[in-house]
Amino acid sequence: MVSTWSGMMTEVPARIVAIGRTASDRALLRRALGELDARHRLSSKIAAEPNLASIMTEFVTRLTDAFGSLSAIRGQAVLDIACGSSSSRSPVTGRQTSEFESWMCRLLVELGAHPVGIDIGDLAGEAFEHHRVDLGVPGALDFLASGSFDAIHESRLFGSPEFRAAHGSATERIRREIRRQERRLLRPGGVLIHSDGQPHG
């Protein structure tokens, strides 16, 4: 059952839905956001943490820019590196926060894609393929088959205070390893979507 957004939140989904470039994309977004609300209480989490609306808007914009239309995402295999988890905590307050949940993978599921989430946090119970992985371990992504993804998304991993605190001087080595793995894992003609929000073919 698709939920409806509470009255005070109607401007939030409307702003996100408006990103869709076609009527078809806007209808697809409306359904996807409704499902995210029903399954993951998106509207109440946005009410508690307003920055989540900006994060969702950014994700929708990235996907639209990368694929040209949201309907083109259906059936695509997408790897989300450091996808976030329900166990994530704010690096500032130390409290659990909805902002770092696996929203991109959840959105991709609702748009008909086949996401694979990679994170060090707990992803148990999520409706997409996921793997708990420490990206600081050399060869951490070797288990994934070469050329198996149409797109790879990585958002804010290397700017994360948590990541820098955990890996310190190894951060640049890890960045080089992840970039090498991205080239190996991406299918010819696939797209990389990095934290600057721009697709890189």
Regions found by a protein language model. Give the residues of each.
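Short "lid" loop at the C-terminus of a central beta-strand within the Rossmann-like core
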Residues: G84, G159, G197-G201
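Class I SAM-dependent methyltransferase SAM/SAH-binding core
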Residues: L79, G84-G139
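A short acidic, Gly/Pro-enriched loop at the edge of an enzyme's catalytic core
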Residues: G139-I152
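Conserved beta-strand signature within the Rossmann-like core of class I S-adenosyl-L-methionine
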Residues: G189-G197
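A short SAM/SAH-binding and catalytic strip from SAM-dependent methyltransferases
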Residues: D150-E172
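Class I SAM-dependent methyltransferase Rossmann-like catalytic core
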Residues: P13-A72
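A short helix->loop->beta-strand "cap" motif at the edges of active sites that frequently abuts
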Residues: L111-A113, R187-G190
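A short glycine-rich, Lys/Arg-flanked "PGG" loop and its adjoining helix->strand segment in the class I
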Residues: G168-P188
